[in-house]
Design a protein with these regions (language model features):
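Domain-level signature for proteins that mediate thiol-based redox and metal-cofactor handling
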Residues: 1-109
Length: 109
């Protein structure tokens, strides 16, 4: 099914909402508010979805766990038929990418 641009934006918003359920177990904050999600691409014709994300450090041992949780979270968005999570390292993650909520929750000014 082909979606309008408005419908695609709505679906991407629901994808982000679903991703807010994926919590970094070390920090206790979701990956969206941590600023780990860099891009979401949703193909309105196929339902294929690509998510570009990073980690707080290159050697983060939670990559597989977070990726698995992302796949699980996408089951809440029925329009998403296939998901590919791409780990990206540029631009590098910094605390400035965190939302105000995340910085307050972690005591960072």
């Amino acid at each position: 099914m082909a979606y309008t641009e408005e419908q695609i934006e709505n679906i991407k918003t629901r994808i982000l909402t679903a991703l807010e359920e994926v919590i970094d177990p070390e920090l206790g904050i979701d990956i969206v508010n941590l600023g780990l999600i860099y891009a979401i691409r949703f193909d309105g014709d196929t339902g294929d979805t690509e998510i570009d994300m990073t980690l707080t450090t290159m050697g983060c041992p939670l990559a597989d766990l977070l990726t698995d949780q992302i796949y699980d979270a996408m089951t809440d968005v029925p329009e998403v038929t296939n998901v590919e999570v791409k780990l990206v390292w540029y631009p590098a993650w910094t605390v400035e990418k965190m939302s105000r909520y995340a910085r307050i929750a972690l005591g960072i000014k």
